[in-house]
UniProtKB/Swiss-Prot annotation:
Highest taxon above the source species: Bacteria
Native species: Mycolicibacterium vanbaalenii (strain DSM 7251 / JCM 13017 / BCRC 16820 / KCTC 9966 / NRRL B-24157 / PYR-1) (Mycobacterium vanbaalenii)
GO molecular function: structural constituent of ribosome
Protein name: Small ribosomal subunit protein uS2
Record keywords, A-Z: Ribonucleoprotein, Ribosomal protein
Length: 273
């Protein structure tokens, strides 16, 4: 069964590109035609590229990797948070803070501070402080939550990132490329395909298109997680099998050696009349 159908792509408006005067010539090979001054994206190619991206994401996650979801434009914010949360992956849907990837050690310290403030609030750590101190701590916590909440459980840089609108998320793209982190992204007609490892030609401005393609990536993550869980269960079952004691191993080795000798003896014995 196809990951997504042509009808779903058409219904979401994934085929609509930008106006013909706002385009990147490198995207020419992904364009089917133009109508009324708007480029129409070749959805047949989109389907092919979706399959490639889906397989990459699934395999990456199955082997223990993680995918960061990035989309801070209004049209993408909701679906980015919703789909990433559904599959337990980190996401950025507010503002990309410089160094989120390239200076993760510093970002990780801010995450620790966020958790520290949350723990203080929940365990009564704010009690006994002045109203001004409580207000300052609460503001600090809310600010950290807003900017870092989506990556609160991220322990290291992701294995790959999913991006909605590479032009808007140019900082995230630049950091990922600097660290050689693979980029999966929607490629609208004004984007640069050379910056993306796993492109999906499509409309990155329509809410439904961004949501559909983000859901596809999340589904690939979910399938990868299932494969990872299955592999883990098989490994656990193998490790759980109780090893043979030394005397049992010797007995088994003796039985294995004795069997061929007995068979040879029977073959050499003369028949009795």
């Amino acid at each position: 069964m196809a990951v997504v159908t042509m009808k779903q792509l058409l219904d979401s408006g994934a085929h609509f590109g930008h106006q013909t005067r706002r385009w990147n010539p490198k995207m020419k090979r992904f364009i089917f035609t133009d109508r009324n001054g708007i480029y129409i994206i070749d959805l047949q190619q989109t389907l092919t590229y979706i399959d490639k991206a889906y397989e990459f994401v699934k395999e990456t996650v199955a082997h223990g990797g993680s995918i960061m979801f990035v989309g801070t434009k209004k049209q993408a914010q909701e679906s980015i948070a919703e789909e990433a949360t559904r599959v337990g992956m980190p996401y950025v849907n507010q503002r990309w803070l410089g160094g989120m990837l390239t200076n993760f050690s510093t970002v990780h310290k801010r995450l620790q501070r966020l958790k520290e403030l949350e723990a203080m609030e929940q365990t009564g750590g704010f009690e006994g402080r002045t109203k001004k101190e409580i207000l300052m701590l609460t503001r600090e916590k809310n600010k950290l939550e807003r900017s870092l909440g989506g990556i609160r459980d991220m322990q290291k840089v992701p294995s790959a990132i999913w991006v909605v609108d590479t032009n808007k998320e140019h900082l995230a793209v630049a950091e990922a490329r600097k660290l050689n982190i693979p980029i999966i992204a929607i490629l609208d007609t004004n984007c640069d395909p050379d910056l993306v490892d796993y492109p999906i030609p499509g409309n990155d401005d329509a809410i439904r298109s961004a949501a559909l393609l983000t859901k596809v990536v999340a589904s690939a993550v979910a399938e990868g997680l299932q494969a990872r869980a299955g592999a883990g269960a098989d490994k656990a079952a193998a490790e759980a099998a109780e090893p043979l004691a030394e005397w049992e191993q010797e007995l088994l080795a003796g039985a294995t050696t004795a069997a061929p000798e007995a068979a040879a003896g029977e073959a050499a014995a003369p028949e009795q009349s």
